[in-house]
Amino acid sequence: MSKSKVENDIVEKQKIISSLTLMDDLFMKVVLQDKECTEYILQTIMGDSTLKLKRQSLQKNLSNLHGHSLVLDCLCEDGNNNIYNIEIQNNISGAEPKRARYHAGLMDMHYLNKGNHFSQLPKSYVIFITANDVLHGKLQIYHIERTIQESGKPFWDESHIIYFNTSYVDNSPLGKLAEDFHAKETEQMNSDILSKRVALLKNAKPNEKGGKEMNVLLENYRKKALKEGIEKGIEKGIEKGREEEYIAKQKVIQLMGLLAEHGRIDDIKKSSIDQEYLQSLLLEFGL
């Protein structure tokens, strides 16, 4: 690889890294490798500054031999044996109520061992951190729990679902956390804990610990972009069943690969929802 090529790659990688926020799920998983960051986020959402975690697992696979398995963004347990599933959701489809229900159900299945009584189920929280107000209630946070309709009293099954709407920013602790989730620059962040971790990752040299983590992250972004491009192209090609449509989708696949190689992650995201922008990129690359 020529020197100019190496230099260009470094510049492109730095552009990607600079554009990342906590709402980028892959970046968030790297940030949460520091358990103190997970604790701070939970403390703020739960309104409990004393909350401490015993353990956490990122990209935790919850298998289901008889149905749909899940890979959880973050699964953790506090000192009182309460369990939390934290999910970063940028798309409405990823934060549907029935998805939250399924997460809670599969967590219960994995935390109740054979022979144990149901009373031994831990208190559980499924927390969706969303980019938009997916429940359309114009609220910053939503707490969902079962109630007895006839009396209006709580049904104490200790299963909780929380939606944290990060599009709502104000001067409250939750509002400041929401602002931090969308900040590209550490100087814009309110939390010292989060900003310190983000700065370490974004400013680290390639041979340093944070730099190595970011190299893995960028490779995962490349693989994800290629996979999404291929799946999208194949799906559309099969649906249409026409040769010209198939050829067009092959061009989209090729485009996604080129964009990934050039580190243009924002263009991949935008082209997936903007058809005119997709066409302009195809022209740019002569496809």
Show where each model-derived region lies.
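Accessory alpha/beta interaction modules
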Residues: 1-160, 170-172, 220, 228, ...
